[in-house]
Amino acid sequence: MNDHQKNHATSQDDNTKSTPSKNSKHIKIKLWHFILVILGIILLTSIITVVSTILISHQKSGLNKEQRANLKKIEYVYQTLNKDYYKKQSSDKLTQSAIDGMVKELKDPYSEYMTAEETKQFNEGVSGDFVGIGAEMQKKNEQISVTSPMKDSPAEKAGIQPKDIVTQVNHHSVVGKPLDQVVKMVRGKKGTYVTLTIKRGSQEKDIKIKRDTIHVKSVEYEKKGNVGVLTINKFQSNTSGELKSAIIKAHKQGIRHIILDLRNNPGGLLDEAVKMANIFIDKGNTVVQLEKGKDKEELKTSNQALKQAKDMKVSILVNEGSASASEVFTGAMKDYHKAKVYGSKTFGKGIVQTIREFSDGSLIKYTEMKWLTPDGHYIHGKGIRPDVSISTPKYQSLNVIPDNKTYHQGEKDKNVKTMKIGLKALGYPIDNETNIFDEQLESAIKTFQQDNNLKVNGNFDKKTNDKFTEKLVEKANKKDTVLNDLLNKLK
């Protein structure tokens, strides 16, 4: 989409020729007079064209007189600073700052302006596609290691294995570099090559890998006894197609009860939420109502429900991280009594964002309307309450402690409570959850540091924080208490 459209006024010359009559020699028009007439016509036509173009432009812009004056003021300030400021300014930065200022004034966390690079990353997240090698990586013990290569990915075909330690990318050391920086080094243009120097056991070798388009699936299926668990990570392009395929596969395996796990699913594409609901809800039914002032629109299902889905009982698992499109889908399934909802109250995001892309690759994302469930429930700031509550262990809901500060005994801070809850979950003796850094916490930290080969000083420093977070994530991934509780309820 271009930044704006130009209106062009097109004129067509009259090419009809008139044949001179025999009396034409008696018609005496001085050449200079003829030229003046023609110039007058051209000038008049030009003035009319310019005025018409300006009027049309103003009408099509949708701006009133006051708004046009404000826009002119912004343009004047931009030109003045660009031309007359005593230090040379970047035109791009001035433009971005002006846009950022307007968006910030909205005080809306969901509206934002993105640069071309940020837009690229955003689109990758929406589509699920990116160019790379298809290797999941993590930073552990100050080393970059491969968690696992994706199936049929360039990394897998090249021989990359789980637990490989990456020491160099294109012969540049990655030791001490942040994980996101290493990932950027690995990614690049499709068809180009990247060389990873990997350490496997005591051996170190270079592996050359050709970059390709990688698709990250948004739906994962796992059979748990006689129940199928379908984890839906986000609503991206073709999430509904992936879900449909997973349901058909589960049905062939004899599964007649599925769990749709939407925990920590932040949402995504609204149309995918509607298509997903259509898997379970027949044609012609409203999935979501959209409202913008007095304007209202209903998004309905366009096909009959999937035959295999009609044979199945459906349970939906949500938590406070289930938001936006996750809530659209859950709300529709709940209103039509197509599923029983378990877990904890959802996030509560009942507004919809629209995207406008510019010709330079940047975009603006802004809130345009609110949405309601088929029965008219507005969940913004309220969330959707489950039919059956399953509480999440405290340690799984903890906020990450900022690593730019070291905490000592005697301090009073909200993050101290997080340390206590986390260490208690990891098996260390803590008998209170106050926000005061006491002797008991210091003793527990010393034991934790000793158990994990860290410097033993009783202070909660960056390295202790990193290991603390790592251990809690490992514990959460190892035993999903909420899912296990639901599976037990369904027996």
Swiss-Prot record:
| SMART domains for the chain | PDZ (SM00228), TSPc (SM00245)
Q: Which Pfam families match?
A: CtpB_N-like (PF22694), PDZ_6 (PF17820), Peptidase_S41 (PF03572), PG_binding_1 (PF01471)
**InterPro entries assigned:** ClpP/crotonase-like_dom_sf, CtpA/B_N, PDZ, PDZ_6, PDZ_sf, Peptidase_S41A, Peptidoglycan-bd-like, PGBD-like_sf
Q: Where is the protein situated, by its record's location annotation? A: Cell membrane
Protease: present as a keyword of the record? yes
As recorded in UniProt, its EC number(s) are: 3.4.21.-
Which residue ranges does UniProt annotate as crossing the membrane? 31-51
What segment(s) does the record annotate as region Disordered? 1-22
Q: Any keyword Protease? A: yes
**Tell me, which GO biological process terms does this entry list?**
proteolysis; signal transduction
Catalytic residues, chain numbering: 324 (charge relay system), 335 (charge relay system), 349 (charge relay system)
Q: Which CDD domains match?
A: cpPDZ_CPP-like, Peptidase_S41_CPP
| GO molecular function terms listed in the Swiss-Prot or TrEMBL record | endopeptidase activity; serine-type peptidase activity
Domain PDZ: start-end pairs: 119-201
The first-level EC class reads hydrolase
Gene Ontology cellular component list: outer membrane-bounded periplasmic space; plasma membrane
Q: How does it sit in the membrane?
A: Single-pass membrane protein
Query: Compositional bias (Polar residues) spans?
Result: 8-22
What keywords does the record list, in alphabetical order?
Cell membrane, Hydrolase, Membrane, Protease, Serine protease, Transmembrane, Transmembrane helix
Family per UniProt? Belongs to the peptidase S41A family.
Q: This chain belongs to which protein, by name?
A: Probable CtpA-like serine protease
Organism classification: Bacteria, Bacillati, Bacillota, Bacilli, Bacillales
